Regions:
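Active-site core of glycosidic bond-cleaving carbohydrate-active enzymes
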Residues: 1-170
Length: 170
């Protein structure tokens, strides 16, 4: 985020090898491109969400950050490797968790809909449907937040960035 906000790549460059080791570790332990390593949506209000889904989305996010950093630092081989890995992770998530007929991820919790939407996992042709499902879920829940730590960051952003800022404000 420091690089994105200030354009200063020093911290990202200093951490590059550590990020790479971390992504490689998760990759070694995720042969099907899906991970359940992590806490999941810790401390949810009431509804539990798939730990594998949320962990895999963050595995995708971390891999994507690494790929973009590799490009920034002129590490072409790493850029190609981690870009391909990120796409494989995204494809595996959507294959296992996205019901293309309904536009629902996993069980359809606020977290399970907002996390893939906010982090760019949802296929372009499905964004509107997934966002509408998220909005409907929030309304069905009385405009109350029903997420844990991971969903908390994603929920309002996913709504706001997909045409439901008024609902996010409520």
């Amino acid at each position: 985020n420091i690089y994105l906000f200030y354009g200063d790549s020093k911290l990202l460059e200093d951490c590059y090898e550590n990020i790479k080791r971390y992504v490689d570790y998760v990759d070694r332990n995720s042969p099907q491109y899906l991970s359940d390593w992590g806490r999941g949506d810790w401390v949810p209000v009431k509804t539990l969400s798939s730990k594998e889904l949320t962990s895999s989305v963050y595995y995708y996010v971390d891999t994507n950050i690494l790929a973009h950093a590799a490009k920034l630092f002129g590490k072409q081989d790493d850029y190609e490797k981690y870009t391909a890995l990120a796409e494989n992770i995204k494809e595996a998530i959507n294959k296992k968790y996205l019901n293309r007929d309904t536009g629902i991820y996993a069980g359809g919790s606020q977290t399970e809909l907002s996390v893939p939407l906010m982090w760019g996992v949802v296929p372009e042709d499905m964004k509107a449907k997934v966002a509408a499902n998220l909005a409907n879920k929030v309304q069905k829940d009385g405009c109350h937040v029903d997420v844990g730590v991971l969903g908390c960051k994603a929920l309002l952003n996913a709504l706001s960035e997909n045409g439901y800022a008024d609902l996010a404000f409520q």
